[in-house]
Amino acid sequence: MRRKLRLGLALGSGSARGWAHIGVIRALEERGIRPDVVCGTSIGALVGAAYASGELDRLEKWVTGLAWTNVVRLMDLTWRGGLIRGTRLFTLFRTIFQDREISELPVPYGAIATELHSGRELWLRHGNVLEAVRASCAMPGLFTPVVRDGTVLVDGGLVNPVPVSMCRALGAELVVAVDLSWGKLGPYRQSKDRKVAPREVPGWLDRLRPNWFQGKTHAEGPSIPSIFDVFMTSLDIVEMRVARSRLAGEPADVLITPLLPDFATMDFHRAKEAIAEGRAAVERMGPLLAQVLG
């Protein structure tokens, strides 16, 4: 009788596109595929932690109920190391999810972060789950860095956007990876469904909005993106190139690539679309999944 190989699931970075990971996991479960190891980077660390702790249902219920106004209200402005402090968001997470240690999770789990001063890749395998997720999600310029054990940590997507290597180090013999960087670069588009009544927008955001968050549309020639979109797209380019390089040297056995080209960094209110595309991406890879995983 053939021994069942230990399966790892590597969930990549990708900001709001990361809700596609929920759809990927749901589609894999429907095929009877359940990972033995889960590793994530940035938003992948969040979804991976929810799965590893058995709380994916709670996360899915919360994200599918998000409106753009909810996203705006969770932004707590700071000018120290980033635009958003993140305290409000992660305080909310502590009310939604159980506060656990990584060692207590029923499924082996790890998150990737970057040590800011050295550029070193750090594997977070111990300590509080939400603190590890917060460090892995600390997107430079957007969220403030996290200080952990005397080191300053930022988003793991800078060094390892799709953590196949960590899955294998934790004992995975086969790895299914989800890369969210496919198809995300292209002509600038304004994000969908972002109309918010003035009274619902914090004063600080309303003051920043004209120059920082709103691009300019021209009748002739390409539209000019906002400062925020230029910065975030530049970060996307870096992470995409790093992901291609890492995956060439550390390939997954199955690579799943949700396509969400019109998703902006902060489109967290569009979870239903992302989840549906995550499911569709698994369906596209159905024959290979059957061949590799049996």
What does each model-found stretch correspond to?
Residues 1-41, 49-294:
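Patatin-like phospholipase
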